[in-house]
Amino acid sequence: MDKYTNKKLRNQVFQKFIERHVKKEQFYLIEDCNTFLSFVADKTLEKQKLYKANSCRNRFCPVCAWRKARKDALGLSLMMQYIKQEESKEFIFLTLTTPNVKAEALEDEIKHYNASFRRMSNRKIFKDVVKGYVRKLEITYNKKRDDYNPHFHVLIAVNKSYFTDKRYYINQKKWLELWRSATKDESITQVHVQKIKQNNNKE
């Protein structure tokens, strides 16, 4: 329950931002989101599983996004195992970010992110390396500065030879260069990229 309580508190912050962007009916759903939770448990009551809840299903709601992320993580894990075994691929985990923005600029920044990633993914160097990818947008809030940081987490499938073939390997410096070029923002100081281990934990 503590996890849900923490996310519900974040939902209350989210309400202030989203109210002017959605219809009244949708806002009421967001405001009421996960105020009712029904669990099933074993005889000891130690293991509990959520059975039913009144979710708003808004993609940016902290509670709904968290629950969807947990479900997606399981699906991704199974997919990765299958692709590694059947397609002989490996995976890298890429995080792309830009400087924080204020609430009023967040919507435009998300549109800019999508357009920037589209530009980067259309580059020949990207297409030569990437055999498939799953992309997720995450938005974090800095309470002290009252601003937001949207960023992409990208799971990328590559050939096993990617890590040893100098013709195709893209190092961290090159990924940064590609992202700066795509966003047209030279103020970006870092991107994060790492290989996914066989046991599905990141290095």
For the regions a language model picked out, list residue spans one by one.
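Divalent metal-coordination and catalytic microenvironments
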Residues: 55, 94, 151
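Short microdomains enriched in Cys/His and/or Lys/Arg
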Residues: 71-104
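Conserved His + Asp/Glu catalytic blocks
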Residues: 86, 99-203
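N-terminal alpha-helical interaction blocks
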Residues: 1-51
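Short metal-coordination and nucleic-acid-contact micro-motifs, chiefly zinc-binding Cys/His arrays
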Residues: 54-60
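Core catalytic machinery and nucleic-acid-binding channels of phosphodiester-processing enzymes
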Residues: 51, 68, 86
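Short, cysteine/histidine-rich loop/knuckle motifs that typically chelate Zn2+
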Residues: 62-66
